[in-house]
Amino acid sequence: MNAPLGGIWLWLPLLLTWLTPEVSSSWWYMRATGGSSRVMCDNVPGLVSRQRQLCHRHPDVMRAIGLGVAEWTAECQHQFRQHRWNCNTLDRDHSLFGRVLLRSSRESAFVYAISSAGVVFAITRACSQGELKSCSCDPKKKGTAKDSKGTFDWGGCSDNIDHGIKFARAFVDAKERKGKDARALMNLHNNRAGRKAVKRFLKQECKCHGVSGSCTLRTCWLAMADFRKTGDYLWRKYNGAIQVVMNQDGTGFTVANKRFKKPTKNDLVYFENSPDYCIRDRDAGSLGTAGRVCNLTSRGMDSCEVMCCGRGYDTSHVTRMTKCECKFHWCCAVRCQDCLEALDVHTCKAPKSADWAVPT
């Protein structure tokens, strides 16, 4: 007799726990979980009691967070698109990234920061769009104010980013606050850096009122910038991430290399050096770079020499459809023809050892 669908949901958390390593932020798996709020809250493995309480109490916020997971993972993949580790996700793994983030590396620091930022962004946006019962536009942005251009009236809908930060801190940090180990402190630091990054790009937008746009009266509001700005900023922080060690009393960090400055609240921190990600490695969670597309003319991280780790590359000849011979027609359209373009695609060779192909 076939088990009912509800029975499958009851077994799913236990099955995922058996099959995948424990990674702190199991709420990342909310991207792949559909159905009612009860199904989502009770069947995402690894949530602590505080997270489940918030999940049951605010199902609309959880839906926003779930949609936000897809956005910040896409941003992570954009930032790492030219690197050996490309922020690839594992759809059937409740940790979303597998074992790779078990290491306290730069990559872990970035993922925790961008995920925390993504929660702030998703909740704040949902507040402004009227999708959440617990918040709306920023209630503090009312009345008259002044800036370098003079007096203006607060109007429109200012993004309520303080609410987004408050909820993100309560939900995302809940599991880390239960632990007192070094990794929990690292995650909390990078989570906070991610939240602060979103607020950094809050900008004032204004609309002029008056005869012929004379701007005798201005109405202004605060709006978040596109999430790409946050991603670009955290990418720079990733490249300048600071390696740290725990201090003697185990309550904070000190720099691993005394020549470097102490990390600020905006910096990303990490404990362990990253693997090279060249070959498939179960323990490191690395998928390797065999089969990855590389750039023959680049001298950067996406070059065939760097991406392929010196193993060489294969070249295939492919054709693709592109737009060509585009012309502007008055008024107001651009019309193009479809053309076939021939090009060479270079992909990294596999290691000579056969064990690279064993699935993780």
Swiss-Prot record:
Lipidation (O-palmitoleoyl serine): 212
Main location: secreted
InterPro entries linked to this entry: Wnt, Wnt2, Wnt_C, Wnt_CS
Covalent S-S links between cysteines: 76-87, 127-135, 137-157, 206-220, 208-215, 278-309, 294-304, 308-348, 324-339, 326-336, 331-332
Sorted UniProt keywords: Developmental protein, Disulfide bond, Extracellular matrix, Glycoprotein, Lipoprotein, Secreted, Signal, Wnt signaling pathway
Record-level Gene Ontology MF annotations: cytokine activity; frizzled binding
Post-translational modification: Palmitoleoylation is required for efficient binding to frizzled receptors. Depalmitoleoylation leads to Wnt signaling pathway inhibition.
One Pfam family matching this protein: wnt
Domain of life where this protein originates: Eukaryota
Any single GO BP term: cell fate commitment
N-terminal signal peptide: 1-25
Residues carrying a glycan: 295
Localisation per UniProt entry: Secreted, Extracellular space, Extracellular matrix; Secreted
GO cellular component terms listed in the entry, alphabetical order: cytoplasm; extracellular space
Function comment: Ligand for members of the frizzled family of seven transmembrane receptors. Functions in the canonical Wnt signaling pathway that results in activation of transcription factors of the TCF/LEF family.
Protein family per UniProt: Belongs to the Wnt family.
Protein name: Protein Wnt-2
Organism listed in the record: Dasypus novemcinctus (Nine-banded armadillo)
Gene: WNT2
